[in-house]
Amino acid sequence: GPEPFDKKFNQNYIHFFFKKKTKNIKDFLIDQHFVSGIGNIYANEILFLSKINPLKKAKLLSKKNCKEIVSNTKKVLLDAINKGGSSIKDFKSISGVKGDFQKDFKVYQRDGLKCKRLKCIGIIKKKIISNRSSFVCNICQK
């Protein structure tokens, strides 16, 4: 699929691609045929910022949802790049430096903790979706 920063990756591309798809949105975000370069961690963060439940069927996304996914994909990836990536276990850059993006996780690895969104009283819950860990606010991700 297109790179997240490619002009082809836009709300119209997403909306058209998803029109009749019954797969959940999280599976599409980590599918390299749909868009390149989004892994599990970033998919969780993108969906949180977009207020979308990872189990939501792709064909049910509105154009507004699609626009938010595009915008938040770029936001999350730029933030991660600027912070050197995410060092969960032993990841280091080529120069041997650990990334700092994990310090800003909104949902990933926050099972049982309060949602970081202002005025939300939700609790982050871990779910296994397609054999991958997913983290979802039980209130603000619909």
Residue ranges, per PLM feature:
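Hydrophobic/aromatic-lined pockets within catalytic cores
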Residues: 47, 51, 78-81, 141
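Residue-level signal for secondary-structure boundary elements
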Residues: 26, 37, 78-85
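Catalytic cores of DNA base-excision repair glycosylases
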Residues: 34-36, 57-65, 76
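Basic, amphipathic alpha-helical segments enriched in Lys/Arg and hydrophobic/aromatic residues
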Residues: 65-82
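Phosphate/anion-contacting hairpin/loop surfaces
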Residues: 1-37, 42-52, 57
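Short, structured motif recognition centered on aromatic/hydrophobic residues
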Residues: 5-6, 38, 69, 107-110
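C-terminal accessory segment of soluble enzyme catalytic cores
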Residues: 81-142
